[in-house]
Curated annotation (Swiss-Prot):
Binds 1 NAD(+) per subunit. NAD(+) binds at residues 165-167, 199, 228-233, 251, 300, 321-323, 375. InterPro entries: Adenosylhomocyst_ase-like_sf, Adenosylhomocysteinase-like, Ado_hCys_hydrolase_NAD-bd, NAD(P)-bd_dom_sf, S-Ado-L-homoCys_hydrolase_CS. CDD domains: SAHH (cd00401). Its EC number is 3.13.2.1. GO terms for cellular component: cytosol. It comes from Pseudomonas syringae pv. syringae (strain B728a). Keywords: Cytoplasm, Hydrolase, NAD, One-carbon metabolism. May play a key role in the regulation of the intracellular concentration of adenosylhomocysteine. It is found in: Cytoplasm. It catalyses: S-adenosyl-L-homocysteine + H2O = L-homocysteine + adenosine. Its main location: cytoplasm. Pathway: Amino-acid biosynthesis; L-homocysteine biosynthesis; L-homocysteine from S-adenosyl-L-homocysteine: step 1/1. This is Adenosylhomocysteinase. The gene is ahcY.
Amino acid sequence: MSAVMTPAEFNDYKVADISLAAWGRRETIIAESEMPALMGLRRKYAGDQPLKGAKILGCIHMTIQTAVLIETLVALGAEVRWSSCNIFSTQDQAAAAIAAAGIPVFAWKGETEEEYEWCIEQTILKDGQPWDANMILDDGGDLTEIIHKKYPAMLDKIHGVTEETTTGVHRLLDMLAKGELKIPAINVNDSVTKSKNDNKYGCRHSLNDAIKRGTDHLLSGKQALVIGYGDVGKGSAQSLRQEGMIVKVTEVDPICAMQACMDGFELVSPFIDGENDGTEASIDKALLGKIDLIVTTTGNVNVCDSNMLKALKKRAVVCNIGHFDNEIDTAFMRKNWAWEEVKPQVHKIHRTGPGSFDAQNDDYLILLAEGRLVNLGNATGHPSRIMDGSFANQVLAQIFLFEQKYADLAPAKKSERLTVEVLPKKLDEEVALEMVRGFGGVVTKLTKTQADYIGVTVEGPFKPDAYRY
């Protein structure tokens, strides 16, 4: 898409600077060339218009790659309204390009918490009234939660939600268990072409980039502690190892802990004998006193707590590549220590008490992105080729749910369909095949004899649902 409209013709948006649209358009065109799966779906399904009639509320990082996602949804027939799921992650040129194309978007880099909530509200509302949306595309679950709590009547017309992240999936499963979830959900996060690409390979690329942009530090030879060794933690540990860091890992899951050991990382705990009793006495101060960089990757709360922050080496860098800013106890830091802004999304946290500080003091931590997503706060996030798989999954998930027409079902049928499910493996394989073609790769085809021997069809799916890639 390349249409550019003037603000006089269209004003259903709020971005930092609409004059950045031409820049955003140039970057979007480049991103399209690096997103073969998404563009392949656009070409494959444009004639059928499978999303014609879909009205999608979207809340996901408003980046250049998201611009390609949005315009793919529109090209397949959808109408959308958009906001960002993070106050620091918007690329203003991307938001401007989408607004200039006549698509409602409310996002800018550096929103306050109040502005963030206002932007989500503007996504939900059109001309001051709830939009007649019938689909949700979410990242982290804030949009889904707001609609359930503040606009429950809208749920009668909504066919479902597709969720991008681990954090959002946890929230959906919690809502389902409590009987609070009113629409079916597709767990995009656990599609193989999302979790292995975005969570693992994406973090491998973007974590070290963000730290270096934020600090200008040489990382080689320094000690890092990665908290968590799920897919995000695996990619993060590799990212730091690539820089020549001495990487240690902490984990609560024995299986992930075993994987860290097998991958050659030292498994440690910031707590003596691995037990956190909530006091400074349980902290392994000898360990944390040598750590130059700590990265949280878990999607859990206070995994880098106040006692750990007190024990960290002077001038250590602290950052998060999970979803929310509560992985690091930033609330404690705000209440008890002085913050000095070095530049946007980079703060010296003086551990000498609240209020004023001595600029020459050397007892400080360097906090990146205020504890929010470091790769989008201090850099530009994952490459287009990585996000290609995630967003192709989102498109197929939106088509899948929209075709199911949950909102039109009889009540008895609705209760059967109220689930949180992973995208069918056949669609996961479709995304992977488009990505392979983008690399110029050639996939070998099974013969009929070979397919029969392992109990699959020649066209796939090629693995049982229980297979772990």
